[in-house]
Regions:
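Residue-level detector of flexible, active-site-proximal loop/helix-junction positions
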Residues: 123, 222-224, 275
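Residues at the C-termini of beta-strands that transition into short coil/loop
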Residues: 120, 219-221, 272
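Residues at the starts of beta-strands that form the adenosine-phosphate
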Residues: 191, 214, 267
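Electropositive, gly/pro-rich neighborhoods at or near active sites that engage anionic ligands
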Residues: 2-210
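Structural motif
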Residues: 191, 244-245
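C-terminal functional extensions of proteins
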Residues: 253-322
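A mid-sequence, solvent-exposed acidic-amphipathic segment
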Residues: 197-243
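Glycine-rich anion-binding loop/nest that anchors nucleotide
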Residues: 196, 245-253, 270-272
């Protein structure tokens, strides 16, 4: 006894809406356009520089510093900022008081051994694709910007946390090539220790780490890695020294880990979804797509990952903290 005009069927496989009634679809699409324009208008004073936003230096400046000065990188995206306020954002990490406190500690850090990076969402968005810019505007609307700004120090100079997402979001795809080349330069002829989730398979079946001298891996949980944080930290300290470049991809856990290891004298880079971005770059993708055999965080927790049977990958694993 439900009127057909009220029925919307959600199709899980591709997250698109199918409408029983064409009029409902027209209304829905028009409402979406109105909401997009509202968010754009609300955000314009910040995009035009009429209202203040944090100082965030470019990804290229960031890469020059980590290469030349051999300093570490902790990245803060919307997930980390949300967890700092004990609100859950990423599906792969629940918020808790201890993680929130540690993230706040790292975010306030002004130590020269580590760069604190912040997603370049708060000012001009011209470099992003229309889809990406509209997504940022919608996210920052309805009081979210104001909540996030409570944690941001307007006197501090940050760097762009999107350094690890150089491809999909940006209009200029040549930019991605430059950033990927700088990353390859960072680990050229160096021993690297990857700290990654159990379904990540970072660098497997591509040439991202081809320039590295040696690759070792520590495998951690793909969800809620912070629950075994001390074990992960101790494992890294066991296998890394001041000559090792540690690369970690564990969501908010990586943000804290990069800080603790930097304070211990070990250069550590939070590489986030760099491998996914590189895979999309190689494929010429224009949206987030499945990468066979690899976890893609942006596709959600229901995305099925096939196990990669790769002997070289298995040989590189020195510890598993699951």
């Amino acid at each position: 006894n439900i009127n057909k005009i009220k029925i919307i069927d959600y199709w899980r496989s591709d997250e698109k809406y199918y409408f029983i009634d064409a009029n409902v679809k027209k209304i829905f699409e028009l409402e979406e356009k109105v909401e997009t324009l509202r968010c754009h208008l609300q955000n314009m004073p910040y995009e035009l520089g009429l209202l203040p936003s944090p100082v965030i230096r470019s990804a290229e400046e960031l890469m020059k510093k980590v290469i030349e000065d051999k300093i570490s990188l902790s990245r803060f995206g919307d997930g980390e900022l949300e967890i700092m306020q004990q609100r859950e954002r990423p599906w792969f990490q629940v918020a808790d008081a201890e993680l929130s406190a540690r993230l706040k500690e790292v975010f306030r850090c002004k130590d020269e051994r580590i760069i604190i990076a912040l997603s370049d969402n708060f000012g001009n968005l011209d470099r992003y694709t229309e889809v990406s810019a509209d997504g940022i505007r919608k996210y920052l609307s309805n009081g979210i910007r104001e909540k996030l700004m409570e944690a941001i120090d307007m006197t501090q100079v940050y760097y762009d946390a999107y350094v690890t997402r150089p491809y999909l979001m940006n209009k200029d795809k040549r930019y991605a090539q430059r950033i990927f080349e700088m990353f390859k330069c960072l680990w050229r002829d160096r021993d690297i220790l990857l700290v990654e989730g159990s379904k990540s398979y970072i660098g497997i079946r591509n040439d991202l780490f081809e320039s590295a001298r040696k690759i070792r891996r520590i495998i951690a949980p793909c969800k809620n890695a912070f629950s075994v944080y001390d074990k992960i930290l101790n494992s890294v300290k066991q296998y890394a020294d001041e000559n090792t470049l540690v690369l970690c991809s564990l969501g908010p856990t990586a943000t804290v880990l990069a800080y603790d290891l930097a304070m211990a004298g070990i250069q550590t880079i939070d590489i986030g979804q760099l491998d996914n971005e590189y895979e999309w770059y190689l494929r010429g993708a224009d949206e987030a797509i499945e990468v066979p055999g690899k976890c893609v965080a942006g596709l959600g927790q229901h995305y099925e990952v096939q196990i990669i049977e790769d002997e070289e990958y298995k040989k590189q694993i020195v510890d598993s903290v699951i």
